[in-house]
Regions:
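Generic preference for hydrophobic/aromatic residues in regular secondary structure cores
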Residues: 1-3, 215
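Glycine-centered secondary-structure boundary/capping sites
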Residues: 58-63, 211, 227, 240
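Conserved alpha-helical substructure of the radical SAM core
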Residues: 3-171, 182, 186, 190, ...
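Catalytic cores of alpha/beta
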Residues: 160, 225-239
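Conserved strand-turn element in the central/C-terminal portion of the radical SAM core barrel
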Residues: 151, 200-230
Length: 240
């Protein structure tokens, strides 16, 4: 628990990164951000992060901190029709749109002093935005850790995947909810498993050829009745 004797005014006056880091470690606050995002911390960011954590634990309503994690949707459009997703079902009343790079740049410029993590996805397929790689690179230049989640069920133009992998992206999440087309498309409707696997293989090849340690590749399967017989096989697939 947070030391009740340590108030926010005291923290605001601390000018030692190491002291602030120690307080975060003692209170296990770093669990709220990806461990690889710690490399982008500076004095201003860690101070805001610590204050935000204390305000959250104290259920504060009058906040002095700013958000240390942002979710920005490059688009709310998607190429799939997943039945449990409002976008896939067409249930959302929001008009489909694409985030312009100028608007994204403004968000980063306003948040770069305190934003630690940026998740560039929410209700759409982020790679449908032609400026996605440019967005990732701009966030990377401003020391912001980035993550996207993609279905990877699109045939991309030459060099797109290489540009994505070398953009500064920190983590790429891909859900593969079946190891054959019949099972895969029961949830990932309109998706093509072969395309996904080809893209995955190409990403792995690029990272190996260029000896890159990022993006971290996170592959997952949503556990459902139709794919439960493939769970063990999927765990073996992930290790390859």
């Amino acid at each position: 628990m947070v030391d009740k004797n340590l108030d926010i005014k005291q923290i605001q006056n601390i000018e030692s990164f190491d002291i602030l880091k120690k307080i975060c470690e003692e209170n296990n606050f770093f669990k709220y951000i990806n461990k690889f995002a710690l490399e982008n911390l500076n004095l201003k960011k860690i101070k805001n992060f610590l204050i935000a954590c204390i305000e959250e634990q104290n259920y504060s309503t009058n906040l002095t901190s700013l958000p240390y994690k942002l979710i920005v949707d490059p688009t709310n459009a998607c190429n799939l029709g997943c039945p449990l997703c409002p976008t896939g079902l067409g249930a959302s009343e929001r008009k489909k749109g694409i985030l312009k790079f100028g608007d994204f740049k403004r968000i980063v410029d306003e948040s770069k002093d305190y934003c630690i993590e940026l998740h560039l996805y929410n209700w759409g397929e982020p790679t449908l935005n032609k400026d996605l790689i440019k967005m990732i690179n701009y966030a990377h230049q401003n020391k912001i850790w980035t993550r996207i989640s993609s279905n990877m069920s699109l045939k991309y133009k030459d060099n797109y995947l290489e540009d994505l992998v070398t953009s500064g992206l920190n983590l790429l999440h891909i859900d593969i909810d079946g190891l054959d087309q019949e099972v895969y498309e029961k949830y990932r409707k309109k998706g093509n498993l072969k395309t996904v696997l080809n893209n995955l293989e190409e990403i792995i090849k690029i990272t190996k050829d260029k000896s890159l340690n990022k993006p971290v590749l996170e592959v997952a399967m949503l556990a459902m009745r139709q794919n439960e017989h493939q769970h063990n096989e999927f765990m073996s697939f992930k290790k390859k």
